[in-house]
Amino acid sequence: MTTIKWQTAGADPEGWLSRVEKVIHLNPDGRAPSLAAPPEGNLRVGVDLGTAYTVLVVLDEAGNPLAGEYQFAQVVRDGLVVDFFGAVNLLKTLKDKAERRIGRPLTRAASGYPPGVPRAEVRATTHVVEAAGMVCERLVAEPEAANQVLGIHNGVVVDVGGGTTGIAVLENGKVVYTADEATGGTHFSLVIAGATGLSFDQAEVLKKTTSEQAGLFPLVRPVMEKVGTIIMRHLRGSAPESITLVGGTALFPGMAEVVQQVTGIPTRVPAHPMFITPLGIALSDNDT
């Protein structure tokens, strides 16, 4: 058994996540950074097949971030793989890019799934990973994976992705309840498209344009409020210390504030929320 990095990450997640940006985000010249030499030891690979983005991250044996690749693609809808061959080809592309950067082949990976997804669909995720050339030996519920990074003891982790909102309630460091509902960033785009007359693809671009987000906030606020309502419904009377929002949708300004207003529970968004879950998926693969 090797050292599990998330124990350190959970104690100081912001410090650990500050290093993630260096290996996942592109350099100003548009080229992703490569390693000076191939890493030694086993690698931990996490694959997150999202409704909006597919993300692949690579960690070393101790859990240090080495490389990450991501791309927008609608190969999954509400947690279900709807374009198998598209998902496989996309993952192969991300895998090839990561392999070139680290100088080693990726032969195995862990992947995640939204809570409540039918078992057959969970297996479909495994099939995508293996068709892309990696053995998939571990699957983990996405909000549980996120807490591998966050290390929350008593609270709620909410993974607001493109199509679904996944919830994990933690007590004494253990997940005691999980749930998933079909609300996420895609619904932001649908609302924006309906209000502006834009196509869905145009609304997606507008949603992610920083200079436009303040003006779009009144349109998407009801969706944010729905996320808060979903959380309250699944808490079922429990009183967690905090709510932590992860997933790409959590990047939209005002998300944490609206959820806190609806729930009355302190709510935060950590650094790089889109990468929390795939990093946790990789960290979950601790049988290297």
Which residues are covered by each model-predicted region?
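A structural feature that tracks compact, well-ordered secondary-structure segments
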Residues: G166-A168
